[in-house]
Swiss-Prot record:
Entry EC number(s): 3.2.2.27
Protein name: Uracil-DNA glycosylase
Signal peptide interval: none
Subcellular location, record wording: Cytoplasm
UniProt xrefs under NCBIfam families: PRK05254.1-1, PRK05254.1-2, PRK05254.1-4, PRK05254.1-5, ung
Alphabetical keyword list: Cytoplasm, DNA damage, DNA repair, Hydrolase
GO biological process, one term: base-excision repair, AP site formation via deaminated base removal
One protein family per Pfam: UDG
HAMAP family reported in the protein's UniProt record: UDG
The organism's place on the tree of life at top rank: Bacteria
Length: 228
């Protein structure tokens, strides 16, 4: 079995990687990357898992699929590379972070400081065709990310932040007896005013972590960063 993720996620997801469904997904992606512009770059597909090993995960921020404009997607939900303009959803996340905890927005969207503390920045679908949102839905990614969420849920002690209807569907595979769910509208400009703003996800996540005996996340991002 080829190593796709260089930490304990490889073992956790091995049954998926060895499944016929993943073989079909792999064949689909091989053709897509050969003939179209696909984001993120192939070596960044599993970046969220690389940044935050399974045994370190305390929080999951679940997105839908990667950004589909040039230079944006880095393989981690809502994050962009240093030097890339902040997408509107991330601008709204920063506004809510300031409203919730008082941290002023930083001028980059590189969220690795969160990932380093145990925040898994996971999209439900890990690839997308340029300019075509949701174009890689229903090709097999959902089974892999469901398996990742189910494994974390079984381990327990995780706060799942579910923004928007697609993310909320993942609640079906989360055991709420030993994990916490914080759900609201999506931070996109289309829906942020319908329940995302004012939802205080950051302080509520830290309260849930402390209730489970875990250390809180320092949500304040550094002003200067460089990409790994």
């Amino acid at each position: 079995m080829k190593t796709l993720i260089h930490n304990d996620w490889q073992t956790v997801l091995e049954p998926v990687f060895e499944s016929p469904e993943y073989a079909q997904l792999h064949a689909f992606l091989k053709e897509e990357y050969a003939t179209k512009t696909i984001y993120p770059e192939m070596h960044h597909i599993f970046q969220a898992f690389e940044w935050t090993p399974f045994h370190d995960v305390k929080v999951v921020i679940l997105g839908q699929d990667p950004y589909h404009n040039p230079r944006q997607a880095v393989g981690a939900s809502f994050a962009v590379a240093p030097g890339v303009a902040l997408p509107p959803s991330l601008q709204n996340i920063y506004k809510e972070l300031q409203s919730d905890l008082g941290y002023p927005p930083v001028h980059h969207g590189y969220l690795k400081a969160w990932a380093d503390q145990g925040v898994l920045l996971l999209n439900a679908v890990l690839t997308v065709q340029a300019g075509e949102a949701y174009s890689h839905q229903n090709h097999g990614w959902e089974e892999l990310t469901d398996a990742a969420i189910a494994a974390l849920s079984a381990r327990g002690g995780v706060v799942f932040i579910l923004w928007g209807n697609a993310a909320k569907k993942k609640a079906a595979v989360i055991d709420t007896s030993k994990n916490a769910i914080i759900a609201s509208a999506h931070p996109s400009p289309l829906s942020a005013s319908r329940g995302f703003f004012g939802s205080r996800p950051f302080s509520r996540t830290n309260a849930a972590l402390e209730k489970m005996g875990e250390a809180p996340i320092n949500w304040q991002l550094p002003e200067t960063v460089k990409a790994d």
